[in-house]
Amino acid sequence: MTMRIFNFSPGPATLPEPVLRQAQDEMLEWNAVGASVMEISHRTVEFMELAKGIESDLRCLLGVPDDYAVLFLSGGATTQQALLPLNFAAPGQTADYVVTGHWSKTALKQASPYVNINVVADGERGGFQHIPSRAGWRLSKDAAYVHMTANETIHGVEFRQTPDVGDVPLFADFSSSIAADLIDVSKYDLIYAGAQKNLGPVGICVVIVRRTLLERTGQPRADIFTYASHAERDSMLNTPPTFNWYLLGLTVKWMLAEGGVQEFARRNQAKAQLVYQTIDQSGGFYRNGVAAAVRSRMNIPFFLPNVEQDARFAAEAKAAGLLSLKGHKALGGIRASLYNAMPLAGVQALVAFMHDFQQRYG
């Protein structure tokens, strides 16, 4: 019998076992159509009904208002980062970017060929261990939008409140924290999220955008790069990643059945607290320097006394059935990703291993 390990990968990430088992059961034939869902046309009545149901479920899960369009697009968050200025910034216009870690820097880089960038706040001087106070942000007078990254998977910092940016549209990358805690969607004008952390497999991205924004002219671009065109065609302007869409739908249904975002917020707080307590009570053997008020509940980086210990920890953890704990190459150390599908038992196993490792090598 195949053994399932605890997978702490930052993405592609662990998927709920019930979702995997249902997909396994339906692999050869889905919905009595005589074929797999990945084999049928996205234009069939069956798949179009599936797509509508998934959108309805996602709206229910996240509380998406009716005046927002919900798009399911091929690719991931990086693609959206390049499309934002093309769709919503006029030539020569400025966009404001809040830099809180590696991925907000990536968003800025992807947008920079198409819009003038104003960095309103930059946490790099502090080693990305805090989020600069809103009072010190240098917002532009006529910015096309303000962009933020809700959770930084590498440096482990997270916005706990939605920043007030006035009348300027607020855009947010929620790839690693969507559905992890309750948010008021109406406080954002556009949310995008690659699915491979909390929503499903890699290869599909959700975009939630205020419909009035779709009226902006933006810059010259093809239809395939135009959000309004995708909205008009119900995310079927081109052939979508149907199997990924289906798996996303199963994951959303699973989250609803488990109690919705409110329940996962409770679980995620409890899981993260276990790990942070172990770090903070280790007497410095494990270190996490992120300011307590902005510590991520999804991604927890930490360091041992030296790089040799980091490597030994990751190797022994893997042998113990705790997978993908090696930190990102940009930062090093160890990183535990605790997305919605990570069960409490996995975190308890990690914490037990941390205690054992410290006893043996501390």
Swiss-Prot record:
It is found in: Cytoplasm. Pathway: Amino-acid biosynthesis; L-serine biosynthesis; L-serine from 3-phospho-D-glycerate: step 2/3; Cofactor biosynthesis; pyridoxine 5'-phosphate biosynthesis; pyridoxine 5'-phosphate from D-erythrose 4-phosphate: step 3/5. Its EC number is 2.6.1.52. Transmembrane segments: none annotated. InterPro entries: Aminotrans_V_dom (IPR000192), Pser_aminoTfrase (IPR022278), PyrdxlP-dep_Trfase (IPR015424), PyrdxlP-dep_Trfase_major (IPR015421), PyrdxlP-dep_Trfase_small (IPR015422). It catalyses: O-phospho-L-serine + 2-oxoglutarate = 3-phosphooxypyruvate + L-glutamate; 4-(phosphooxy)-L-threonine + 2-oxoglutarate = (R)-3-hydroxy-2-oxo-4-phosphooxybutanoate + L-glutamate. The modification N6-(pyridoxal phosphate)lysine is found at residue 197. GO terms for molecular function: O-phospho-L-serine:2-oxoglutarate aminotransferase activity; pyridoxal phosphate binding. Catalyzes the reversible conversion of 3-phosphohydroxypyruvate to phosphoserine and of 3-hydroxy-2-oxo-4-phosphonooxybutanoate to phosphohydroxythreonine. Belongs to the class-V pyridoxal-phosphate-dependent aminotransferase family. SerC subfamily. Homodimer. This is Phosphoserine aminotransferase. It comes from Xylella fastidiosa (strain 9a5c). The gene is serC.
